[in-house]
Amino acid sequence: MSQFDEKNKHIDVMGIRKILPHRYPFALLDKIVDWSIEDRTIVAHKNVTINEDFFNGHFPEFPVMPGVLIVEAMAQATAILGELMAETLFAHVVAKAGGGRRTFMLAGIDKVRVKRPVVPGDVLVIESRMVKQKNIICTAESVAKVDGQIVCSAELMAAYKDY
């Protein structure tokens, strides 16, 4: 991911599309506002609007973002961090890939806690930090916040795989 410069910490939605294979309706992040290879951290934003398809059924009279989609947004932020770190963290895997397309795929979810509802108008701020890496598997601690309060936390595992 050498096309992204660590001096410019912002990545817009078009940059995200260059990193992740996700597309509508599963492209859940709007922008990256900060990231660091050295600190192994990333901060991403998701603007939650009433126009989200999932609000049609979850729940029409009290629209709440499903917890599993909050976790998916956290996983996407973590995958972007992994992609940005791939040339250093996974240099041995990248070297063997032979130019093939690889991405981080969710491999495990532990210690999930959903602490409060996320509703239309909220800005979901996702913070992830890589805490462990072994071969092609990495583990991250991730939290999602609204107005500075934690709404969800999880430990995520991802595998760097061909697709």
UniProtKB/Swiss-Prot annotation:
EC number(s) reported in the record: 4.2.1.59
Keyword Lipid biosynthesis: yes
Matching Pfam families: FabA (PF07977)
MF (Gene Ontology): (3R)-hydroxyacyl-[acyl-carrier-protein] dehydratase activity
Catalytic residues (positions): 58
GO biological process: one example: fatty acid biosynthetic process
Enzyme category, top tier: lyase
Swiss-Prot/TrEMBL keywords: Cytoplasm, Lipid A biosynthesis, Lipid biosynthesis, Lipid metabolism, Lyase
GO cellular component: cytoplasm; membrane
Intracellular or extracellular location(s): Cytoplasm
InterPro entries, per the entry: FabA_FabZ (IPR013114), FabZ (IPR010084), HotDog_dom_sf (IPR029069)
Reaction(s) the record says it catalyses: a (3R)-hydroxyacyl-[ACP] = a (2E)-enoyl-[ACP] + H2O
NCBIfam families in the record: fabZ (TIGR01750), PRK00006.1 (NF000582)
Function: Involved in unsaturated fatty acids biosynthesis. Catalyzes the dehydration of short chain beta-hydroxyacyl-ACPs and long chain saturated and unsaturated beta-hydroxyacyl-ACPs.
Family according to the record: Belongs to the thioester dehydratase family. FabZ subfamily.
PANTHER family, per database record: 3-HYDROXYACYL-[ACYL-CARRIER-PROTEIN] DEHYDRATASE
Protein name per the record: 3-hydroxyacyl-[acyl-carrier-protein] dehydratase FabZ
Organism: Francisella philomiragia subsp. philomiragia (strain ATCC 25017 / CCUG 19701 / FSC 153 / O#319-036)
Primary gene name: fabZ
